[in-house]
Amino acid sequence: MKRKILSLLFTVLMLNVYSQTSLDYKVFEKINEYRVENGLNELIWCKKTFLSVEVHTKYMIVEGRLSHIENSTTPKFTDRLMVFVDNDYILGNENVSMVSINGIEDSIDDIAEKIVDSWKVSKGHNKAMLNKKSNVGAVNCGNSVFTKNNYDFKVVYSTFVLWLDS
C-alpha cells in the first residue's frame, strides 16, 4: 500500500515536469543504432523509465558525483524504477556517466557520441547496453559544472536504464 501511495505521489509530481530533451533522444537513438549493429532489437522508449532516470540524473547533479546508488529511500535503480512502474520484479541494467563537454557543448551529436562511447569502452556498461533480454529503456542527461584544481569543466551527467517489460 505504501508503495502505491508513493508511486501515485511521485507520478503526480513528475507528470508536470516530464521533458525529454533532444540530447536524451539523441543518446537513446545512438544506443539503438549500436544495438542494431550488434544484431539486437531496438529498445522501446518508456516514459515511466524516463521518470526514474530523470530522478537519478538530478540526484547526481545535486550531489556533484557519479554514482549508481543514492542515499535515499530508493537507493538502487530497481527501487527507483518500481516507484513508477507497476512491477514487483525488475530485470535490467543501469548505466551512468559524467563526460566533459568543453569544446563540444554546442553539438548534441558530439555530446551523445561521447556519452555512448564512454559506455562502449567500459566492459560492464557495454554489456548492459547490449543486454539481449531488455526491450524498453530511457535516458536522461543533465548539465553541470565540475571544478578540479581551480578549473571549471562543463559536464553532462547521464543515466540510462534498460529492462525487460514482459
Question: Where do the language-model regions lie?
Answer:
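A well-ordered secondary-structure block
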Residues: 76-165
